[in-house]
Amino acid sequence: MERLRRTVVQLEEAKRLILNGEVARLRLAVILLDNAVEVILHRRVNDTLRSANTYARMLQRFRDGQLDAKGEALRQEIAAKTIPQARQKKVARFFGEKLTLLSEDGELPAATARALRHLHDYRNELQHHDHVRQESIRPAALILFDIAVDLMVTLVPGSMSFGSDDNIDWLNDYGIEPIPFGRDDLREVIGTKLRHGLPLDVDGVRAALIAHLGARLDAMDANSAELAGYGLSPKDLAGMLQHHRRWEQGLPDAPSDAADIAPFDKLHSLVRWRSNAAGLTSIDDKLDLFDRFGTLEDELEPLERGLQEVVDAIEAAGEVASDIARGA
């Protein structure tokens, strides 16, 4: 019960931060929610690994050599339920491996796993790299909250105990009697109350994501048009970007690789990306919606960043030239 309480407190705090709406608080909400999800996954995975190790011990009881058909079938059935130690170490360490294992076991829908991979990348960006995507952080926080509550309800650890020192008065806030022993709907009731008051409808999330992508594509079109006005080819742009990035890193200049024009080899994709963004209007499932949004965002971001860097570098060079001309 204490573990459930810790998860609920995180979700309550994340909800409060989301309702506030300030970007700085939405950032904290995403960090809290990502941690809550990872802890929920960790608890469920631990149960899975304990079960797998039990089967591994059972497997050791079989004698070596060929068994009769029935015995061999049983041995193969038990062996299929074990997990190699090397994989267990990866599952214990990596978020993505936890998602893969629970998806393979049928405990985590594929759409949920895909969305969580994108959202975990969001958390890594804003926590470790201080990169906050301001226009999409609110929809991301809402979807992550929705998933976290769903996992709290569905990924129940193998057992839940009540200790004599447990404080269960907090259940009163959810309309649950002080002694909820035997209730099968405890988590569902808590989840319903947690979701109340948040705009978790798919229409609102969809509109925000499409508007966000539209604004970014507009900026990319404007930057592309500006650079085209200078008569610069994708090869020219790639060379300028490579030169600029080496200069920023304090590295000596080097000849550009003429064959490598990334990310400007994707300039022709702008029309397709805009069409794909418009296509999100037909998606009614939030998880599928965010999965497609995240995939599209990951695809366009290298070109978006490259265009902006070259535009900024040209503008900075122009300002330096103006200062020199004025004798500044």
Label every PLM stretch briefly.
Residues 26-48:
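Short, hydrophobic, well-ordered secondary-structure elements
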Residues 19-23, 45, 49, 128-131:
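Short, flexible helix-adjacent loops and helix caps
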Residues 9-27:
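A long, hydrophobic alpha-helical segment
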Residues 3-15, 117-124:
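Active-site-adjacent bridging/hinge elements
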Residues 131-328:
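Polyanionic, low-complexity intrinsically disordered segments
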Residues 29, 48-59, 165-170:
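Short, glycine/acidic-rich hinge or "gate" loops at secondary-structure transitions
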